[in-house]
Swiss-Prot record:
Ranges for region Complementarity-determining-3: 89-97
Name of the protein in its database record: Ig kappa chain V-V region HP R16.7
Chain spans, region Framework-1: 1-23
Isomerase among keywords: no
PROSITE patterns named in the record: IG_LIKE
Organism of this sequence: Mus musculus (Mouse)
Length: 108
């Protein structure tokens, strides 16, 4: 199985900040990388698929980049509603494995 690693498990930022969350695959996944958002109430939403393609209805402040084994999700102009845990998932091969998640919190 392909292992997905998110080295930062939690991240604090201020509203309006630009935040980048990284993800690394144990082998080349040919850009088959998705990003999911899990809100504190448990709601899960697909944000980005195939590295950089924005899912329908997702605000343009979200963007994705990367290639090979290294990928990132960037949130520009952080809003309160973006407070959530973010997971990467590889779709290159079965099983479609997930990273451990990065919890985004507001800096006090």
């Amino acid at each position: 199985d392909i292992q997905m690693t998110q080295t930062t498990s939690s991240l604090s930022a201020s509203l309006g900040d630009r935040v980048t969350i990284s993800c690394r695959a144990s082998q080349d996944i040919s850009n088959y990388l998705n990003w999911y958002q899990q809100k504190p109430d448990g709601t899960v939403k697909l944000l980005i698929y195939y590295t950089s393609r924005l899912h329908s209805g997702v605000p343009s402040r979200f963007s994705g980049s990367g290639s090979g084994t290294d990928y990132s999700l960037t949130i520009s102009n952080l809003e309160q509603e973006d407070i959530a845990t973010y997971f990467c998932q590889q779709g290159n091969s079965l099983p479609r494995t997930f990273g451990g998640g990065t919890k985004l919190e507001i800096k006090r």
